[in-house]
């Protein structure tokens, strides 16, 4: 609706959630959110899990949670165990739940429902969810199940564009699609727990990042931090910094 113009998106967001910067259209939020409780997380220590995955560039088996942990977790060099980083606030346990109430105008009902449906399908909310951490599941609001997350889904098609066109923008803005349909990854089987899903996600990510054409061929010396193909997927990469980026 907005031609993927981030300025128009920001203005629309400002009118919906309130703003003090739209010169002739500053307003209060049309949406109100209320949580049933604001309890702090209760998990202050990390239960050791098996070192259940292998990485072709690492000499020893590793813990999938540590591999995907990017920040909350670290490896204690003395005990060789996965632990929370120092001074980290207690985290929310995987099995915890809360009640979210949303009050909104009738005119924003469709947009709110679509947003909730996408959150439910993909289990994620923006940058707060990464590598499976921060994942969540919504119940209620007449949300469709995973069986509707398929190539023929009209709502997903509305939010998709051809893969090559997507590269014209330098920010994530749409689902990609090719001649075969939507480019959405799904695991071959469901998992009973978050930890089981994290093992599968770690294996997939390692396999994807270590494909032959993404093996480091330029950035081999830590003293000469040059950009390589794998950096196009994500940054930082452990032991493979890029000059000018290393300290950022």
State each model region's role.
Residues 1-248:
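Basic, Gly/Ser/Thr-rich N-terminal segments that form RNA-phosphate-binding interfaces in CRISPR RAMP
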